[in-house]
């Protein structure tokens, strides 16, 4: 599992040892999820530069507002490799590989390291979480938004089911077996260590899918309980999470793997988190 330092940096995952882990039983002892107590991160988003600014992002540099959003849409929608839903399994084994154990992946909401071979539907297995819930726009698992690895992550099956298709917001009761995650009737709050990751994945989807090429027009809004509408919230909270939890080495590496070997496009908000505030003011 990953831990965060006092400076807000995410440390490599720590594997199960009796003195480091607190084991919590889930579903009356059927499932055990190992977790550690972690420190919230706080940081201000500042302007960044990347090796891609003079090439990949050259048509976006210097823009703001809708012109920036539209430029990024064109950039991240060009020459993209689209996966089938079955191909997502193997892709996630690359993108979310545990840097300390190449046989494992890191699960999004719990932060645990679990065998790549443990993918499935059982409560103690991991499955493919659509961070932008697939019912929001009703795109299902269709090639395109339903298989875009930039918002698909390995997640514990039980915790994924608890999140369901809820919008993201702060508050609620702590999720049993997944400390740091909270939920209520219409929203889900992930643990502090991945709040920014979640925000940047959701905002990527809102830029990538704008109603062209037969895909739904996905838009973030400042609501919860969006149902099957092609909207996901809560925008004001997502912006806050982007500010407070900046991209770390794991998230940046994941972006590189997707670009280099999987889809061949990037999440611009990992490379330039300050662009969130330039588009959604």
Segments the model singles out, each with a brief description of its role:
Residues 11, 32, 65-68, 180-183, ...:
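Polar low-complexity intrinsically disordered regions enriched in Ser/Thr and small residues
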Residues 120-281:
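Domain-level detector of nuclease and nuclease-like folds
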Residues 8, 115, 276-277:
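A broad, structure-centric signal for solvent-exposed, well-ordered loop/edge residues
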Residues 6-44:
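Secretory targeting and sorting signals
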């Amino acid at each position: 599992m990953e831990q965060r330092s006092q400076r807000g940096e995410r440390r490599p995952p720590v594997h199960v040892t009796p003195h480091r882990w607190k084991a919590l039983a889930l579903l009356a002892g059927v499932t055990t999820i190992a977790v550690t107590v972690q420190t919230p991160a706080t940081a201000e988003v500042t302007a960044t530069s990347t090796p891609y600014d003079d090439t990949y992002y050259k048509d976006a540099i210097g823009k703001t507002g809708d012109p920036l959003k539209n430029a990024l849409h064109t950039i991240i929608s060009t020459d993209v490799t689209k996966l089938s839903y079955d191909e997502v399994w193997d892709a996630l084994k690359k993108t979310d590989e545990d840097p300390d154990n190449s046989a494992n992946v890191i699960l999004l909401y719990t932060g645990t390291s679990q065998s790549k071979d443990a993918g499935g539907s059982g409560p103690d297995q991991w499955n493919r979480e659509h961070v932008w819930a697939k019912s929001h726009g009703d795109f299902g698992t269709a090639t395109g938004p339903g298989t875009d690895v930039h918002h698909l992550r390995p997640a514990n099956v039980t915790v994924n089911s608890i999140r369901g298709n809820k919008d993201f917001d702060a508050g609620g009761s702590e999720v049993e077996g997944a400390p740091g995650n909270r939920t209520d009737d219409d929203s889900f709050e992930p643990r502090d260590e991945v709040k920014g990751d979640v925000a940047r994945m959701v905002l990527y989807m809102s830029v990538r899918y704008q109603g062209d090429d037969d895909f739904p027009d996905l838009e973030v809004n400042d609501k919860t309980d969006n149902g099957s509408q092609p909207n996901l919230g809560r925008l004001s909270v997502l912006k806050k999470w982007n500010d407070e939890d900046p991209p770390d080495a794991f998230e940046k590496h994941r972006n590189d793997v997707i670009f280099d070997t999987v889809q061949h496009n990037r999440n611009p908000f990992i490379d330039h988190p300050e662009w969130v505030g330039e588009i959604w003011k």
